[in-house]
Amino acid sequence: MSDQQQSTTQAFPSSDQQQSSTQAFVKKTAAQRKLYESGNELAAYAAKQINYHIMGYYPITPSTQIAENLDLSGARGEHNIRLIAAEGEHSAAGICYGASAGGGRVFNATSANGLLYALEQFPVQSGTRMPMVMNVACRTVSGPLCIKGDHSDIMYLLNTGWIILFADDPQMVYDFNLIALKLAEKVNLPVVVAFDGFFTSHQKQKCMVFSEDETVQHFIGKKLSCDNPEISAFARNDSTGENRFYSVLDLNHPVSVGSYMNEPDIINNKYQLFLAMEETRKKLPMLFDEFASLSGRMHTFCRGYLCEDADII
């Protein structure tokens, strides 16, 4: 087998390799407990533990339960997230964009035609490098009307500059929601956690979650502000290598966001977007390792299926 083929095979481990890797990583440094929940419920639970600033949303099947569960837990005093119900998904995405530009941590959830209604907003959010997290419970795009699960909606996001993490069970929905925000703030890009509508969004499984919200918040880390004289550009890396973020509400550091661009600025913007995507390839394995040391659950880029005897994948 050539070096290229070998590296390709290693990049796409088999299901058996993935399972053995996960089982081998038994060291768990954080207390956890069992929950019997669906993907939607665990997406909401992860958001509750993160304690986002804002969720701009508009309900649509099969992702409606995410906002519903967050609203219920908020009524119980379990988080401080401000849920803002918009008049439609386009407006919900605008709420998220404005809140992120204002320095907030932002969360959203949608599906199918709701995603398409908001589609215009997504390249703007990535192109102006606003970190946020959106869950997509994947569903058939209507035409004719259908609410069954497929990937016809998420495919529209492929060229919008968003990172997409696909979760194939409720446990991964929980884990990826925690990893997604940290990744978003590492590379200054918005991240989608996508999962199958009804199959993953509604079916319940036994899952492990961190016992304390503080564990999650320590893993995510604080969102660093740019109230620092050494920081002179949007999302400039500081001496520690951590991203710091401007806020349009920070009057001490005024900044214009989304201003008009011609060549060569627009070309440079797209190249910077490409570099951020490439940086994701480096950051994501590091975050997987960090998360595994905390949870005992190891994730990889891809899972192979019947790849054991393949020469090329």
Predicted regions and their residues:
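Short basic, glycine-rich beta-strand/loop surfaces that mediate nucleic-acid
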Residues: 127, 180, 207-209
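A cross-taxon signal for low-complexity, glycine/charged-rich
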Residues: 7-9, 15-24, 224-227, 236
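Conserved anion/nucleotide-ligand pocket segment
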Residues: 171-205
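Thiamine diphosphate
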Residues: 2-3, 23-156, 161, 178, ...
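Flexible, glycine/proline-enriched loop segments at strand-loop-helix junctions
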Residues: 160-172, 189, 274
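Conformationally flexible catalytic loops at phosphate/diphosphate-handling active centers
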Residues: 191-304
